[in-house]
């Protein structure tokens, strides 16, 4: 179920502060964040965020196409190694 439009997008408060500090300083450093649930806003375009996936911070460069999506969508948490091969079929 989608979020109600009257509530507006969810963004953690500390994330807005970090983005504002980064814009003021002018440095293009990776902003480490743990809030995968936050929505990407237009003021984040051009910034690089390190989104935590449970193990490390995955760098995400925000573009205009990403606006309205969640940060967690760009930092996968599970590693897929493929299905295990059938050992009986390998012997033949």
UniProtKB/Swiss-Prot annotation:
Keywords: Ribonucleoprotein, Ribosomal protein, RNA-binding, rRNA-binding. PROSITE patterns: RIBOSOMAL_S19 (PS00323). One of its GO terms (molecular function) is rRNA binding. The keyword GTP-binding does not apply. InterPro entries: Ribosomal_uS19, Ribosomal_uS19_bac-type, Ribosomal_uS19_CS, Ribosomal_uS19_SF. One of its GO terms (cellular component) is small ribosomal subunit. Disulfide bonds: none annotated. It comes from the Bacteria. GO terms for biological process: ribosomal small subunit assembly; translation. Pfam families: Ribosomal_S19. Transmembrane segments: none annotated. Belongs to the universal ribosomal protein uS19 family. HAMAP family: Ribosomal_uS19. Protein S19 forms a complex with S13 that binds strongly to the 16S ribosomal RNA. This is Small ribosomal subunit protein uS19. The gene is rpsS.
């Amino acid at each position: 179920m989608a979020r109600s439009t009257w509530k507006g997008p969810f963004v953690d408060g500390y994330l807005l502060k970090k983005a504002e500090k980064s814009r003021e300083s002018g440095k293009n450093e990776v902003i480490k964040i743990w809030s995968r649930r936050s929505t990407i806003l237009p003021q984040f375009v051009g910034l690089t965020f390190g989104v935590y996936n449970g193990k490390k911070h995955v760098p995400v460069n925000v573009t205009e196409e990403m606006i309205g999506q969640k940060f967690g969508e760009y930092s996968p948490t599970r590693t897929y190694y493929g299905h295990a091969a059938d050992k009986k079929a390998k012997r033949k």
